[in-house]
Design a protein with these regions (language model features):
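A structural signal for short, well-ordered beta-strand segments and their strand-loop junctions
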Residues: 31, 54-55, 81-86, 140, ...
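C-terminal catalytic/acceptor-binding lobe
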Residues: 138, 144, 148-248
């Protein structure tokens, strides 16, 4: 479904060893060592030929089968800025750490009997994921349009790429879409980068521990993770680790 390119940065020799192992494991994926984050991000975006683009971070999981036919591009004919894979009628919690809610707004229509459409502009004054059109957690955008917006501001991490983005730049596309149920979950169990949040409060596991396990052939076993009660875009899930597990 996606033509994948991974922009990565290893801060220690042990992390470099793990990335080397990962690169060998997935030879069909293009891995790009990060230098200048903004410049590298723009170059990666421009290197694609597809009309759309999506961004993911390393704690995103596509947990539900995702099937998109080419006609999904029709959504962009309806003033839609993005197709969100992280939103759906099931994502009723805004923040699992505080318990705040994010009820799906009134739907203005359903495009191609699949894509639920609403005006993010009408609810943008509320602090809710349904009123924020830009995310690095699996939103799909028109590629050339989003590249032109990246030239407007400075960013040096995925968090600042999202956090410093001015949503009013997308006012000319006042609508968002999602499918009935979300397909992607961000499970924040540890913290990468300089931004601070409450990651890892419930099922935290350190980067060092995950990396050490990976180098010892212990892997996250996604088949054993409980995805039965996804209620939030950012929701901690307990990771199940299997050692000496043969991948493919």
């Amino acid at each position: 479904l996606f033509n994948l390119k991974v922009l990565y940065h290893a801060t220690t020799e042990e992390y470099s060893k793990a990335y080397k192992k990962l690169i060998e494991r997935f030879p069909s994926v293009v891995f790009i060592k990060q230098g200048n984050f903004k410049q590298d991000t723009l170059e990666v975006c421009k290197s694609f030929s597809e009309p759309t683009i999506a961004f993911f971070v390393d704690d995103d999981i596509i947990y539900r089968k995702l099937e998109l036919q080419e006609d999904f591009l029709d959504i962009f004919k309806h003033g839609v800025c993005s197709l969100s894979l992280r939103l759906g009628s099931n994502t009723v919690i805004q923040d699992t750490h505080t318990g705040s809610r994010a009820i799906m707004p009134q739907v203005d229509g359903v495009i191609n009997d699949k894509f639920y459409c609403w005006s993010w502009k009408n609810i943008s004054q509320y602090h809710t994921n349904f009123g924020y059109p830009f995310s690095v957690d699996g939103n799909i955008y028109p590629r050339e349009e989003i590249i032109s917006l990246f030239d407007r501001y400075d960013f040096d991490t995925p968090n600042s790429l999202e956090g410093a983005f001015n949503k009013e730049w997308l006012s000319y596309r006042p609508n968002m879409t999602c499918m009935e149920l979300s397909c992607l979950i961000n499970t924040p169990l540890n913290l990468v980068g300089s931004s601070q949040n409450m990651a890892g409060k419930f099922f935290g596991i350190s980067l060092e521990e995950l990396n050490e396990k990976y180098l010892k052939d212990c892997y996250i076993d996604y088949d054993k993770i409980d995805f039965s009660n996804i209620m939030c875009c950012h929701q901690e899930l307990k990771m199940e680790i299997t050692c000496n597990f043969h991948l493919g």
